[in-house]
Amino acid sequence: MADPAAQSSAQPRLQQAQSSGPTGSNSNPGAGSSDPARPGLSQQQWSSQKKAQVRSFPRAKKLEKLGVFSSCKANDACKCNGWKNPNPPTAARMELQQQAASLTETCRSCGHSLAEHVSHLENVSEEEINRLLGMVVDVENLFMSVHKEEDTDTKQVYFYLFKLLRKCILQMGKPVVEGSLGSPPFEKPNIEQGVLNFVQYKFSHLAPKERQTMYELSKMFLLCLNYWKLETPSQFRQRAQKEDAAAYKVDYTRWLCYCHVPQSNDSLPRYETCQVFGRSLLKSIFTVTRRQLLEKFRVEKDKLPPEKRTLILTHFPKFLSMLEEEIYGENSPIWEADFTMPASEGTQLGHQTVLSPVSISGSPHSKGSSASALGVTGLDVASSEPTIGEKRKLPEALTLEDAKRIRVMGDIPMELVNEVMKTITDPAAMLGPETSLLSANAARDETARLEERRGIIEFHVIGNSLSQKSNKKILMWLVGLQNVFSHQLPRMPKEYITRLVFDPKHKTLALIKDGRVIGGICFRMFPTQGFTEIVFCAVTSNEQVKGYGTHLMNHLKEYHIKHGILYFLTYADEYAIGYFKKQGFSKDIKVPKSRYLGYIKDYEGATLMECELNPRIPYTELSHIIKRQKEIIKKLIERKQNQIRKVYPGLTCFKEGVRQIPVESIPGIRETGWKPSAKEKSKELKDPDLLYNMLKNLLAQIKTHPDAWPFMEPVKKSEAPDYYEVIRFPIDLKTMTERLKNRYYVTKKLFIADLQRVITNCREYNPPDSEYCKSANTLEKFFYFKLKEAGLIDK
């Protein structure tokens, strides 16, 4: 089937001739299938051209063609069901060049004349003759489809429709699909209404421009779904339960009869998939369709117009992820028949006609109506009139005291914040270099978040089941998780890992990249106790240092917030404590011991850590939110600076050789409201000689470590010519030794910063799987262990 998804997403204007009719279902969804005799023509285009040709035949030739499908009326005893030419064409597709048969020509089968087969058509209008000829072309089309089709279920449907149209030609009737399939629409609310409700539910609070972007994405998704080729029931059975497979087969048959086949066989009444099906079909097909759709866009990204590329590759994956939550969520309001959004929740979406009962009634589509039905002929959708609503009341859960507490003394007015936000989000108002690439100060999970939006990585909560038939893909992922955990946690017995990963009481949040597992977090939920135990957490070595671990944990936090569990407990070994601290874990355990004693597994030599979740924080977007907050504060500071008239002369002490001065000695610093941090001050060692000796001893231990050899001296240009072009701030252990002798390290922070830069530079220049990076990873663990041992950093 020719799938116009890519074209329609880039330019949401649908040309009906781009979609094909029934062909072999064993082809991949979205793969084009043209008529082999006419290269470059889709099945639908070929069908349209063929109908135009036969309708231009002379009357005699038309009767001959209809006679093939007309029973003999010479007498009641004749059982001939169609006139057969006594002089059949000798080569394929020669019928157009042959002369029309005479009405006196006898049938090769029964011996009666053509006139006795078409006597019922003598007084029939030309319009009706042309309608019947259209059905003849569709019958021939379906006949070829039946022979080419390899899937049994699809072949049966094609054969049924073939017989139905043949019967209609014989009886001069109109085709009506009968039986237990029912008639459209099959479910309410339908997919179109559900998706548009989703946009209204999730994005009505956004600014008009952003809200319009989300609306465009919803139209794009609906348009793709209307022309997307569904997987066959036999393919669906391989990944689903028996009961689900039976329901899907019914929906698939309905889709073939009412949506797919009529695209190229317009004798049958045609309906849009999104207007006659609802949540049940969407649940069955969404995960597979989403993956195939994103893959298709990724492969064909160079064909997309530049103005649509960012929309499709960056925003569309996130849009689909949010929609997925509402499709499979138990209590999503978007599927309620009486779904409404109060006026106070934000401006209503424009183009309200798509939500009206008329547009979802499931009426058959006339030619060329598919584009206008979804309102995709243009993107400039007019906003509806705002409704004047009553004054909003406080939510029931929010008391008056809570409301007062929200208004912080000295808080910045929202008008000012909105004004600053416009400056930050408007590219024309922002000066300076482009920020499209990741900055040096990008958050740890920024790369992972972008990859998820683009569909490069996926997150799935999976587990083994003893009560239901095992899904082959999930079992493969569980085996992959077992391998990752075994490889990354060598001190843990493999049998023990296998037992817990495949234990039905345990679940795992799996990180999938290119169809294979590259990491995961195995956990067990204790809902009655109010906490979850994290058992294993690992990312495969060649995919580390990309922020996957942080993003993985953030997804796990959001998953638990949805399920009402707000505490994590885990036993971390000495190498994992650092990771868990970065993710918000602490050694201070607030969960009462009576709640977890006897529930979680105790590991010798490991430290119990806890993480308390805040249900108001969107963890997967937290770093992005904090970054935006910093940008706002920076802009507010700039505004404040413009109001301060007092200007101090620049500092001259650095020209005289002074390397560092206390912050409080900067002229005017205290007038801005700055105060020194007593806590930070007390942390530094006051005796410089004591600090010097401690750092000297530590540096000596690092230099004698077996994995320190690549970092002993500066990198030579002869060995790496482009090194100093890539690395802006080179550092090595020899340079650090000289700095230590010159008393450069007046604080421990300067020393630790140089040590960390040694490792960072190595990772930036060398491939992750190189010997240098492996040495850097080992050395980093060693010196952080020594720093903790010496009390220079918190344990």
Curated annotation (Swiss-Prot):
One of its GO terms (biological process) is limb development. Residues 597-606 are annotated as: Loop 3. Transmembrane segments: none annotated. Its EC number is 2.3.1.48, 2.3.1.-. Residues 461-614 form the N-acetyltransferase domain. It catalyses: L-lysyl-[histone] + acetyl-CoA = N(6)-acetyl-L-lysyl-[histone] + CoA + H(+); L-lysyl-[protein] + acetyl-CoA = N(6)-acetyl-L-lysyl-[protein] + CoA + H(+); succinyl-CoA + L-lysyl-[protein] = N(6)-succinyl-L-lysyl-[protein] + CoA + H(+); glutaryl-CoA + L-lysyl-[protein] = N(6)-glutaryl-L-lysyl-[protein] + CoA + H(+). Belongs to the acetyltransferase family. GCN5 subfamily. This is Histone acetyltransferase KAT2A. It comes from Danio rerio. The gene is kat2a.
